[in-house]
Amino acid sequence: MNNCQLPLSDVQSRQDHRRLDIDKVGVKNIRYPIVVKDRSVGSQSTTARINMYVNLPHQFKGTHMSRFLEVLAENQRAISIENLPKLLKEVKQRLDAEEAHIELDFPYFITKKAPVSGVEALMDYQVHFSGVMRGNAYQLTLTVEVPVTSLCPCSKEISAYGAHNQRSHVKVSVQFSQFVWIEEVVDLVERNASCELFTILKRPDEKFVTEKAYDNPKFVEDMVRDLADELTHDPRISWFAVESENFESIHNHSAYAFIEGGQRS
C-alpha cells in the first residue's frame, strides 16, 4: 500500500540513446465537434476527425500523449479554423516541441438547388485543413474533395449516339495569402466539370444534367488543366495541387491526373 504513494516514473522523459529524431509523433482519429465558416449563414457546426503531432528530439524516449487531449479539452468551445494558430502554439508549449501539426478532416454541407425544379437539398463535401507551426511560422493548407460528373470526349466523338460518363472525385489543395471560402473551391471544381452533382433531381433536372454533361465532355486531363489554369491566375493562391480520379464506367480501373503549381511553404 505504501508503494502507491511513491512518485510514478515518467518513462517518456527518459533518455533514448539511438540518436534518431522523430518527425511526427502524436494522436490520430480523435472525433471532436468544430465550427467552420459558412459563406451562406456565417458558421456551420460539424464533427471532425483530428490528428495532432509534434516533432520529438532524439534524446527523448517518448512524447506525452495525454497532453494533446488536454489542449483539446481546454479549448473544446473554441475549436475552429481561425483558432488553429492558438491551438498549435499551446501544443508546442505543452509538449516543449519545435513544431506542431494539427489536421482536421470533416464533412461540410452546402444547400444546392436542382437546376430546373429548384428543389433544395444538402450536399456533402469532404474537407481537410492541415495547420503547421514551425517556430513562429504558421502555414495552413485547405483541401476540398468534390464529386462531379465527367463525360468522355473520345466516346462522344466516335459513337453514333451517347457517350460513356461517370462520377469523378476531384481534390483541390491550396495554400493562400488571403482567405478562401470552402464554397469557392467547390464552385471552381463544379464549373470545370462536365456537370455537377445534386442530391435531388426530378425528371426535368435529370434531363438537364444529362444534356449538360454531353455538351461539356472532359478528359481527366482537361479537368486538372482547367482547374490549374484558374488557380494559377488567382493572386491569393501561393501553392496548389489538383488531382482527379474518374471511376470509369466502361473499365474496371480509374483514370487519374495530377498537377501541382506555385511555391509550397
Curated annotation (Swiss-Prot):
Coiled coil region boundaries: none
Gene Ontology molecular function: GTP cyclohydrolase I activity
Keywords, ordered alphabetically: Hydrolase
Biological role stated in the UniProt entry: Converts GTP to 7,8-dihydroneopterin triphosphate.
Alphabetized HAMAP family for the sequence: GTP_cyclohydrol_B (MF_01527_B)
Leader peptide range in chain numbering: none
InterPro entries per record: GTP_cyclohydrolase_FolE2 (IPR022838), GTP_cyclohydrolase_FolE2/MptA (IPR003801)
E.C. numbers: 3.5.4.16
Protein name as annotated: GTP cyclohydrolase FolE2
